């Protein structure tokens, strides 16, 4: 089995609405899991840095513009098996993908989650409890737990 390493960046985006904090989650079109917006670094622009990729992915998959609140990302790693070639190619066979994702805490600026791209079938802002119940993958739940600590250090002093 082939092994492939992937590095992605994304955003865990919050929005203050009345006295509540809402968080952006997306349902992926392909695997139907609920996730935070993220994507490969440098797949659309050569020499793209982690922050640029994270902001771009939030806009593409989440339909919103956001700003990075904390320069230090949360890192999560996991492995998954891909049947065929990741991201389009024609080479078949199973591939083991070792994925590392860097998530930045971000604050919503503008836009509507309904304006997401084709990779996402749904995107919405929800309360913290719903995020915890809705996220599909352990790595995203772990990232959210870490981001909440960073969020609290910035906003609940």
Spans of model-derived segments:
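Active-site segment of metal-dependent pyrophosphate-handling enzymes
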Residues: 63-112
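Short, charged/polar surface micro-motifs in flexible loops or helix N-caps
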Residues: 18-19, 30-33, 42, 74, ...
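Conserved Nudix-box catalytic region and its N-terminal flanking loop in Nudix hydrolases
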Residues: 20-65
């Amino acid at each position: 089995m082939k092994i492939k390493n992937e590095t992605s960046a994304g955003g865990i985006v919050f929005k203050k609405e009345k006295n509540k904090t809402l968080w952006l989650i997306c349902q992926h079109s392909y695997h139907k899991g609920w996730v935070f917006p993220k994507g490969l670094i440098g797949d659309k622009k050569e020499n793209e840095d982690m922050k640029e990729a994270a902001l771009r992915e939030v806009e593409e998959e989440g339909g919103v513009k956001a700003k990075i609140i904390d320069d230090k990302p949360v890192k999560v790693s996991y492995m998954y098996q891909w049947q065929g070639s990741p991201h389009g190619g024609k080479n078949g066979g199973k591939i083991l993908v070792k994925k590392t994702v860097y998530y930045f805490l971000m604050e919503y600026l503008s836009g509507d989650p309904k304006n997401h791209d084709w990779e996402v079938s749904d995107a919405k802002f929800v309360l913290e409890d719903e995020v915890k119940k809705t996220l599909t993958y352990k790595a995203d739940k772990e990232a959210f737990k870490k981001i909440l600590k960073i969020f609290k250090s910035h906003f609940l002093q």
